[in-house]
């Protein structure tokens, strides 16, 4: 993983997410990934007992302490240009505290999923026949070409639905206030390389669970630590060699299918 930090891509956009269900004690695993011509590559792994802001903040600071001076493509302790995450406030607050110069972006998929869930929450009183039309307007906000289109769409929402659904108007006002985090037209100055979702880190968790842990739970923390450091690094090293030697099909098979027999640790 240390060698991945030498790539220029490591200093651009870093994808961060957490998952669980990998050991019998319920530890949480955080992955920091970057894009590369060979696909997603890991920059760091954190294993913690919880996802509270204090714990995550401490974990990120410990990670900074072991990173090389030229980490994140030579940017060092300043961190990458931006992080892309889902809307986990504790995680985002911790990232902002540890790497204050980095910009925080929201995954487009999770943004729209959150709006969809809000519309389907019965407490908000949105009629079923209106949810799809309102969702289409939310998508217009996210995929707008400029801020003028965002303002026009917000006026349209207020005109058509504001009086009927005051909670919706209030929700979308708060949503629009965070446009710097989710609007695609406002991240053109960031080298996202077309990645506006957290798919890279989501697929990395599939690799970890399928090809490294073989859909089983680690027996204890030591075994989990070995899996997310030594075994995971070996997997990506083999895949990088496959891509370098022109064996892309082998690299894809390696990521998509787990071996039938588990290797002894």
Can you say where each PLM-predicted feature lies in the sequence?
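A broad, low-specificity signal for short, low-complexity segments enriched in glycine/proline
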Residues: 4-7, 44, 167-169, 202
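An acidic- and aromatic-residue-enriched active-site/binding cleft used to recognize and process polar
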Residues: 19, 35-37, 47-51, 87-89, ...
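Active-site beta-loop-alpha junctions of metal-dependent nucleic acid enzymes
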Residues: 23-25, 45-72
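Extended amphipathic alpha-helical interaction segments
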Residues: 64-265
């Amino acid at each position: 993983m240390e060698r991945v930090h030498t790539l220029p891509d490591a200093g651009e956009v870093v994808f961060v997410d957490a998952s669980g269900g990998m050991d019998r004690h319920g530890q949480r695993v955080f992955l920091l990934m970057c894009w590369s011509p060979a696909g997603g590559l890991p920059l760091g792994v954190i294993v913690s007992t919880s996802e509270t802001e204090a714990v995550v903040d401490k974990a990120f600071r410990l990670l900074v302490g072991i990173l090389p001076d030229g980490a994140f493509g030579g940017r060092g302790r300043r961190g990458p240009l931006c992080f892309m995450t889902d809307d986990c406030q504790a995680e985002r607050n911790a990232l902002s505290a540890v790497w204050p110069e980095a910009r925080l972006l929201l995954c487009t998929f999770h943004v729209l999923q959150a709006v969809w869930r809000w519309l389907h929450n019965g407490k908000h009183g949105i009629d079923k026949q209106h949810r799809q039309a309102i969702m289409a307007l939310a998508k217009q906000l996210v995929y707008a070409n400029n801020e003028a289109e965002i303002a026009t769409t917000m006026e349209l929402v207020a005109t058509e639905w504001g009086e009927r659904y005051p909670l919706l108007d209030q929700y979308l006002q708060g949503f629009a206030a965070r446009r710097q985090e989710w609007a695609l037209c406002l991240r053109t100055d960031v080298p996202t390389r077309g990645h506006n979702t957290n798919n890279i880190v989501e697929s990395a968790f599939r690799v970890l669970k399928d090809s490294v842990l073989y859909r089983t739970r680690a027996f204890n923390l030591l075994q989990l630590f070995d899996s997310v450091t030594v075994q995971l690094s070996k997997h990506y090293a083999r895949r990088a060699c496959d891509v370098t030697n022109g064996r892309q099909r082998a690299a894809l098979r390696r990521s998509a299918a787990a071996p039938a027999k588990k290797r002894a640790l």
